[in-house]
Design a protein with these regions (language model features):
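Formylglycine-dependent sulfatase
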Residues: 1-363, 371-398, 402-411
């Protein structure tokens, strides 16, 4: 939630001069976060990257939510440029050597999109992902003798399309000439495919650096690394998901990828690495969600957490053992793009769309035979639809914010 009651939160110049317009509505202090639990059990904790759970000077800043150290964006909107005017270190605003180019700016009128000089304004001096990476390295180096937890929420490869020139040139040679993206949203790019690939390679290189550092410090076999994403690929800002098969075997276009509850939007890779503990190259089809990381990590750390959560530990799956405890179902709900609910029950996936348009009908897909969710089999399985309906009703919570409430539900 952008917390628009504060003023024009989309005026980037105003936000730069008044941090009270920055950030999102804060996570309540009464919420006991995973970071607070692990911090209270002797771990050094850090959040590096993009934070959107509490604006500056609120109870929601990372330092108030269980993190000893924070470096990065404290605002989702500010992360719409990878060359920001500032970042935050703990609760201190760090001014960078970048002039303000408001996110979503386009090429100047009359500019030639095929001339590299037209894009000079969009490649500045201090690249946020590089600054964050250095801080991640510093945190690990300063805690090699401590138990530590690092949540590294890299802004890569989120648009806008901005990447180190060495990688952009590498992919320009591989991909050849291409149609420029002239910036209908986010920023323009002369070589959008090459730049997107460059962003991925930058992230890959940074992850490799961290793994090498853990090995160099002789703590790799005592460190669990989990690499995953918060959503499927985007289709905006010049990103060509279909060209890269970004969601394969799912669909990567609007209506099916990021922001939507089809598989292309919510099913993401999850890679876990723990030297000498997790079998290399092993693969699991265990049905899981990010809420399960909570209890999994606590179990591995030997931390007892008595409060009931939605997650289950998947330690046995990581270790190649039988996963006795499994989800009966997974549930998703988002107010964006018309309002959506989804339930995954075994091979079946139920989706309700356009709730704000008073739609209450539910589509049903058999993922075992229709992974792209193209054949609605709701009429064939009325009892499964009834079950999905009960789950949606049980799991839904009326939003505290009126604009997120569904009138179709009598709210």
């Amino acid at each position: 939630d952008e917390w628009k009651e504060r003023g024009n939160v989309w005026d980037y110049e105003a936000v730069f001069h008044d941090h009270n317009l920055e950030g999102q509505r804060p996570l309540l202090d009464s919420i006991n976060t995973f970071a607070e639990i692990i911090q209270n059990n002797g771990y050094k904790t850090a959040f590096i990257g993009k934070w959107g759970l509490g604006a500056p000077d609120t109870e929601g800043v990372p330092n108030n939510q269980g993190f000893h150290y924070f470096f990065g964006y404290n605002c989702q909107r500010q992360a719409h440029t990878l060359y920001p005017t500032h970042l935050w270190e703990n609760e201190k605003k760090i001014i960078l050597n970048n002039k303000l180019i408001p996110p979503h700016s386009n090429l100047e009128i009359g500019s030639n999109p095929n001339n590299s000089n037209s894009y000079i304004n969009f490649s500045l001096n201090e690249y946020a992902p590089e600054l964050m990476h250095r801080k991640a390295v510093e945190f690990i180096e300063s805690n090699t003798d401590n138990s530590f937890f690092l949540l590294y929420a890299s802004p890569l490869p989120h648009v806008p399309l901005q990447a180190p020139i060495k990688w952009v040139n590498y992919y320009r040679k591989k991909l050849g000439s291409e149609q420029p993206y002239t910036g209908k949203s986010y920023f323009p790019s002369q070589s959008p495919r090459a730049t997107y690939a460059a962003m991925i390679s930058t992230l890959d290189e940074q992850v490799g650096d961290l793994v090498a550092l853990l090995s160099e410090k002789n703590i790799l076999d005592n460190t669990l690394i989990i690499f995953t994403s918060d959503n499927g690929p985007t289709y905006t800002g010049g990103v060509d998901g279909n060209f890269f098969n970004s969601a394969k075997p799912f669909k990567a276009e609007y209506g099916w990828a990021k922001g939507f509850l089809h598989e292309g939007g919510i099913r993401v890779p999850m890679i876990a690495s723990w030297e000498n503990h997790i079998k290399k190259g092993s693969v699991s089809d265990h049905l899981s969600g990010f809420q399960d990381v909570f209890l999994t990590v606590l179990e591995l750390a030997g931390i007892h957490h008595p409060v009931e959560t939605d997650g289950i530990s998947f330690v046995n799956t990581l270790m190649g053992l039988e996963q006795k405890e499994k989800h009966k179902y997974l549930y998703w709900e988002i107010p964006e793009y018309g309002g959506q609910q989804a339930v995954r029950m075994g091979a079946f996936k139920a989706i309700r769309k356009n709730i704000f348009k008073n739609n209450l009908s539910i589509e049903l897909f058999d993922l075992a035979t229709d992974i792209q969710e193209t054949i609605n089999v709701a009429d064939q399985y009325p009892k499964i639809i009834e079950k999905a309906e009960r789950i949606m009703k049980k799991e839904h919570r009326k939003s505290v914010l009126s604009r997120f409430r569904f009138p179709a539900f009598g709210e």
